[in-house]
């Protein structure tokens, strides 16, 4: 698996010359909040995914999947205790 791009890097392409301030106002969020997403400093929340999907005529699930892929990639690289599989005794 590779290091998936932050959804904010993809969102930048949707701005199409619009200012961050203009898009933030349109989304109903602050400019710093949008800047954090665009710069990869903040995650895409469900609320943000809905706002983006409505503004750019995309699916909220698309944005959430991008975020989930990135989250899983980072989580898979963290050290954590091994988890043993649960016994699956269906004969009982």
PLM regions: where:
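A short, Lys/Arg-rich alpha-helix, primarily the initiator
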Residues: 1-19, 61, 65
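Short alpha-helical DNA-recognition segment
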Residues: 17-36
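Short amphipathic alpha-helical surface patches that mediate protein-protein
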Residues: 28, 39, 57, 68-69
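Short, basic-rich loop-to-helix N-cap that marks the start of a DNA-contacting helix
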Residues: 41-54
